[in-house]
């Protein structure tokens, strides 16, 4: 087809008429100082707190200090080649990370970019890392359990869906092990999990990922990794990124669990940034807003009501509540829970699981100190059968500790005291549990029933765990229907009690442990 000159002129005229001049006004500033990942920018007006600033080389910084004639920003990534005099521009955007089901089974960095070598991630969208927590009216009370699979936790310190339960203890006391087992135990519960690793060795994070894969838990888990080699900015932001990824499920009427491992290292990273920004130091050289650092993060873990979910999904999801349960981890120094960051987080959370070095070294693992560990939600978030059978466990342990200390000085003890001591010893022994072996509700109930009803009285102390393993095996093969009923309903009635008693009598008669 041949076009003549008139048609060509007409086409050009149409194009000129349709042409729109799009002018985009953008703030530009100049870097006047670069120090340890902190840049000071002059001439950048109208910048928001937390706004992303575009740097040369397709990099970003986040504005944290807004001063009269300059802006202090922290660089996200390498900064060695940044020079004074370089031009930067404001983006008008707050930092966002990818969210969605495509992240499940993947290992990502703070910005949501994959670091596991499995290719690109298909995200459902992007959401800001900093969000306002749901208000009081949008929340619902916590009354559904989230099973950790640990006898000592589920019986004495129950965790509910939407709760914030602190895991606190010295280094090497099993804090990460407890959190990882809680994630493994959600395999068949439909709860999506997020594991945020802050300031840990890359080899440690790789080991955690390997264990999750071995136990089939990676399919329902997102791992957000900000290792010790990452910049302080990425370590500080990692928990917020992970929280946004977990909120995706909460806001759509699902249940999610997030583990922050650990918030002590996040506080140290934030202290480093604050001191470099020349903010005035306070107690232990932390900045004045370190409480707000953790409170605004942990308040986002909540159980939201049906109206919130319905409004958020614009009516797509109805009649469902959503929850985000948080297990923040705090590392103490020589058991000092009265330090600045531990006391802050204890006051924010709904209870704490305190792990003790002495218990750990004496072979009691998980090393839960039942005396000062507490759940402020309590029995409201417990399965009925575990609540009924585990009610006397904490009391038995408390009495045992008191009597054990007293019996060291007393030579002759009366029969009742000796019986209490022996019962306490058996409870202590039964609370021991191997790593990567979380128990189902039914198996846990069988163990609690055995100790509560006195079936362990004549079992030697060093044979109790063998007895328990053999009992679980026997119950799962001979009473599979009962085990299924307990796991499905969690109820406890006279019929179940009678069947459990009959099963234990039969099992003890076999002498197979």
Swiss-Prot record:
InterPro entries: ATP_synth_asu-like_sf, ATP_synth_asu_C, ATP_synth_asu_C_sf, ATP_synth_F1_a_nt-bd_dom, ATP_synth_F1_asu, ATPase_a/bsu_AS, ATPase_F1/V1/A1_a/bsu_N, ATPase_F1/V1/A1_a/bsu_N_sf
Domain of life according to the entry: Bacteria
Membrane topology note: Peripheral membrane protein
Record-level GO cellular component terms: plasma membrane; proton-transporting ATP synthase complex
Role summary: Produces ATP from ADP in the presence of a proton gradient across the membrane. The alpha chain is a regulatory subunit.
Family to which this protein belongs: Belongs to the ATPase alpha/beta chains family.
Name by which UniProt lists this protein: ATP synthase subunit alpha 2
Organism: Pseudoalteromonas atlantica (strain T6c / ATCC BAA-1087)
């Amino acid at each position: 087809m041949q076009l003549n000159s008139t048609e060509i002129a007409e086409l050009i005229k149409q194009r000129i008429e349709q042409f729109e001049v799009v002018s985009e006004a953008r703030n530009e500033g100049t870097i006047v100082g670069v120090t340890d990942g902190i840049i000071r920018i002059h001439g950048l007006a109208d910048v928001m707190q937390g706004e992303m600033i575009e740097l040369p080389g397709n990099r970003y910084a986040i504005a944290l200090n807004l001063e009269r004639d300059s802006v202090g920003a922290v660089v996200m990534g390498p900064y060695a080649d940044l020079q004074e005099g370089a031009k930067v521009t404001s983006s008008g955007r707050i930092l966002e990370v990818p969210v969605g089901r495509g992240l499940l089974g993947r290992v990502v960095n703070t910005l949501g970019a994959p670091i596991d070598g499995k290719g690109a991630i298909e995200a459902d969208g992007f959401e800001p890392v900093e969000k306002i927590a749901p208000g009081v009216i949008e929340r619902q009370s916590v009354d559904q359990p989230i099973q950790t699979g640990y006898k000592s936790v589920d019986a004495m310190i129950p965790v509910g869906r939407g709760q914030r339960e602190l895991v606190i203890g010295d280094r090497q006391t099993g804090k990460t092990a407890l959190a990882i087992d809680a994630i493994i135990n959600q395999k068949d519960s439909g709860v999506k999990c997020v594991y945020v690793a802050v300031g840990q060795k890359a080899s440690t994070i790789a080991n955690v990922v390997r264990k999750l894969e071995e136990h089939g838990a990676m399919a329902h888990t997102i791992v957000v990794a900000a290792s010790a080699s990452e910049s302080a900015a990425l370590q500080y932001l990692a928990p917020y990124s992970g929280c946004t990824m977990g909120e995706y499920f909460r806001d759509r009427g699902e249940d999610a669990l997030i583990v922050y491992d650990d918030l002590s290292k996040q506080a140290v990273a934030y202290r480093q940034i604050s001191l470099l920004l020349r903010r005035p130091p306070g107690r232990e050289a932390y900045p004045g807003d370190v409480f707000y650092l953790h409170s605004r993060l942990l308040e986002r873990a909540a159980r939201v009501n049906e109206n919130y979910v319905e409004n958020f999904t614009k009516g797509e999801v109805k009649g469902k509540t959503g929850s985000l349960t948080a297990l923040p981890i705090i590392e103490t120094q020589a058991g000092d829970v009265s330090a600045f960051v531990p006391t802050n987080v204890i006051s924010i959370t709904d209870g704490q699981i305190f792990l003790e070095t002495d218990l750990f070294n004496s072979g009691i693992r998980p090393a839960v100190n039942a005396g000062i560990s507490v759940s402020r939600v309590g029995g409201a978030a417990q399965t009925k059968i575990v609540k009924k059978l585990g009610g006397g466990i904490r009391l038995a342990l408390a009495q045992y500790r008191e009597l054990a200390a007293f019996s060291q000085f007393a030579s002759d003890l009366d029969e009742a005291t000796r019986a209490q001591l022996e019962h306490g010893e058996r409870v202590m022994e039964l609370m021991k549990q191997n790593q990567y072996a979380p128990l189902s509700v039914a198996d846990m109930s069988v163990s609690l029933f055995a100790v509560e009803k006195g079936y362990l009285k004549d079992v030697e102390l060093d044979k109790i765990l063998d007895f328990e393993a053999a009992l679980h095996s026997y119950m799962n093969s001979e009473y599979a229907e009962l085990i299924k009923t307990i796991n499905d309903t969690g109820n406890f009635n006279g019929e179940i009690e009678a069947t459990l008693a009959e099963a234990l009598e039969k099992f003890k008669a076999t002498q197979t442990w």
